[in-house]
Structure formats: C-alpha cells, structure tokens
Amino acid sequence: MRKELLLRTTNHSAFQNSVYLLGFLRFAKFQLSSRANISNVRPFKGRRTNCAATSVHSNRMEVTYLSQSLAQTIDNELMSDDVGYTTEQLMELAGLSIAQIICREYSLDRFKKVLIFCGPGNNGGDGLVAARHLKHFGYDVTVAYPKEKTKVLFQRLLKLLQHYHVPVVKSATGEDLKLYDLVVDALFGFSFTGEPRSPFDEIIHTINQSNKPVVSVDVPSGTNIDGGSAANALSVNSEMNISLMLPKEGVRHYGKKHYLGGRFIPNSIVEKYNLKVPQFAGDNSYVQL
C-alpha cells in the first residue's frame, strides 16, 4: 500500500514538473518574440504634441463649399423636429473638435496661454465650449466676451466656465494680447453679413496688429461668407481656419492650414443636398482639408 502511494505521488510530481517546464518555455518564447518586435519599432519623429498624432488627412478630398443660404438651410434642418439635433448638441460637438484641433496643432509647452474672442452668436457659443475643453487639456484659457448673451444656453456655458476657473473679460487691448501665446477668433460665423461694427471692428484690428498666431472658427471674422470680389476690407488675418459642418464659399481660396470639424451631418442630409463630405479617419471628429 505504501509503495503504491509513493509511486502515485512520484508520478504526480513528475507531471507537475512537466507542466511547469512547458509553461516556462512558452513564457521564454513570448519574451524573446516581444523583444524582437520592440527592436523593430521606429521612434515617432513628428512634432511634439500633447494630443494623439494619428493621421487626419482625408482619403476623399472632394468637399462641398456651402453658400451662406445653403449653410443656413442645413443648419435649420439639423435642428428641426425631423432630424432632432439641439443647439446645445451642435455647440458641444463643434467646440470639442475646435479644442482637439488646437491641441493637435499648438503644443501645450509652447502655446499654453490662450485668449478666445467670443462673439454674440452661436459662433461665440462654440468658442465658449472650446474654452472649457482646452481647460480640460491643460491650457491656461481666458475668454474675451464683449457682448454677453442673456439666453439661458449662453448663461449656462458661462456658469460652467466659472466652475472651471476660466476668466471671462469684457475686452482685451493690444497690451493684453502680449500676455498670450495663441488667439482664437470665434467672433462671427456663417450668418454674419455686412461690415463689422463697433466694438468688433476695433477687436479685429487689435487681433491683426498683435502679431500673434490666430485660429479662426468657421470663417475668419469679417469675411464675406459667399466670397467673390465683395470680400470685406476688414477681416481677421488668421493662420489657420477651422470650418464647421462644411467649409463656406468665403474660405474656398483660404490658402493656409484648414481643418473641418464638427462631425455631425447625417446621411439623410448628405443625400438630400448631394453634399461631398470628406472621409473622417476612424473616431476622429475632424479632418485636415
């Protein structure tokens, strides 16, 4: 009986040792394979940034440039009962993509202090949302809001900024702008008509005289939305434009760095108006045009 028990114990120990040895050999093989793969990885040599460095160039570069009237028609339809978007939803989507694009192009170590000029309309609302997201991303953000809106939506956006400790000021002079690394122009969007009036004409002049890098939201403020020879004499001279929904005719020949943000046009609208929308890569909410 004792011999049989000893034999069983010996056989069981031998089996366990075989299992341990097999596991060790598999682990060693995995380690060698992993080291070989790591040695073949090339270091990323792109510009230093605190945002993801995935490609945002579209493989389908055909894009529809919207007239002012068509942009307004589509915008109204997006917020109709039939489609179902709200102004708040569109602002959040637009503002997030604006912040993500800025984060991609303007690294936190060089452009930490950001001043955002927000206008009285929805373009300004997009700027208020972008300010909050940039604060999330680590930027030191200030909002200049010359004509504060009293609508509940805008007051809620301002209240959020208070809770994020984002300063909101009435104006900013040329001397004030010297304190910032980047200026964002969210004064006027596609609904703007005519010439900029006070205080916005002075603000545009101050921005252009600052020699700071400037990013415009949707169109450089003061631009004639339909383009052509009737372009306004006074408009923001930005180095990058972030179009929303689809680019407008006024920036067809922009000629500088140009992104499309706000990935919110449903298939039904694309088909109804025969729109050409660039292909967004993966889960990106923006694409470089």
Curated annotation (Swiss-Prot):
Question: Binding of K(+): at which residues?
Answer: 123, 185, 221
Enzyme Commission identifier(s): 5.1.99.6
Q: Molecular function (GO) terms listed?
A: metal ion binding; NAD(P)HX epimerase activity; nucleotide binding
Q: Where is the YjeF N-terminal domain?
A: 71-277
Swiss-Prot/TrEMBL catalytic activity? (6R)-NADHX = (6S)-NADHX; (6R)-NADPHX = (6S)-NADPHX
Q: Report the Gene3D superfamilies cross-referenced here.
A: YjeF N-terminal domain
Where is (6S)-NADPHX annotated to bind? 122-126, 189-195, 218
Q: Name one GO cellular component term.
A: mitochondrion
Sorted alphabetically, the keyword list is: Isomerase, Metal-binding, NAD, NADP, Nucleotide-binding, Potassium
Give yes or no: UniProt keyword Iron-sulfur: no
- Name any cofactors this protein relies on: K(+)
Q: What class of enzyme is it?
A: isomerase
What does this protein's record comment on cofactor binding?
Answer: Binds 1 potassium ion per subunit.
Q: Which InterPro entries match?
A: YjeF_N_dom (IPR004443), YjeF_N_dom_sf (IPR036652), YJEFN_prot_NAXE-like (IPR032976)
Query: What is stated as this protein's family in its record?
Result: Belongs to the NnrE/AIBP family.
Q: What does this protein do?
A: Catalyzes the epimerization of the S- and R-forms of NAD(P)HX, a damaged form of NAD(P)H that is a result of enzymatic or heat-dependent hydration. This is a prerequisite for the S-specific NAD(P)H-hydrate dehydratase to allow the repair of both epimers of NAD(P)HX.
Protein name (record): NAD(P)H-hydrate epimerase
